Amino acid sequence: MGSFFAGIKAGTLAGILYVGGMAAFNVLLLYALKPEVLNVISTSYGSICGATAANSTANIESCFDSVVAVDVPYIAFVAFFVALIYAALFGRYYDSLPGNSRTLKAEAMAGLVGVNLVVFGFSGFYFNDTAALATGAFLVAWTIVFGYYLGRLYRKYTRVIEIKSQNPDLLRVLVDNSDLTGKARTFAATSNHKLRAKVSDDASFKGWAPNGGVTLEDPKSFETVMEINGDGSITGRVSKKS
């Protein structure tokens, strides 16, 4: 489990930072290496921007401006949605991801984002060795920053709840129809969830014992609604029938 919507919220803010930084770096790189960029444009798009085209100098400059004004935002747009998709998956499957460190989980997901951007050609501009080295180094460092903020923001928008049973053999705790007895799970802050006690035939349900940021609609009912306002725990109480 985990929170899909918390992942979306965290991914939106962290993603804006991520692609905004990438776009700014790409613009600076293009202007810093403008002579090389103009040479690549002239060579690769000679019929449109090269020396054989009418008013070639103006055309080359126009093509360069198009790279800055069109290609850079396009790359950022695609990169943002790639980051958002993976952030949503990060939130949805957060509790199922291996490891206990929130930061490492987020960094692993950020790494997948970076790899996908490289594989599909949306990580930046690699028109010569200098650009490739600079873009590669920046991408690695900036992806680590993205992972750090993704983890922090996900924690901000979620709460950790421990799901307990007084006697797991007699009572199982179901949250949104999933048996989470004895587990700690993340839920979106200020969210509501269906809580139900599955009691064995030889036991009697004795109510719920919420703690911390957990409140219940009816603590005495075996089936109720749990509201998450902070970290905490919920314990199902049970006794064996005499």
Which residue stretches match the model-derived regions?
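Non-cytosolic beta-sheet module surface loops
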Residues: K164-N167, V199-D201
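Juxtamembrane/disordered regions of integral membrane proteins
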Residues: M1-V160
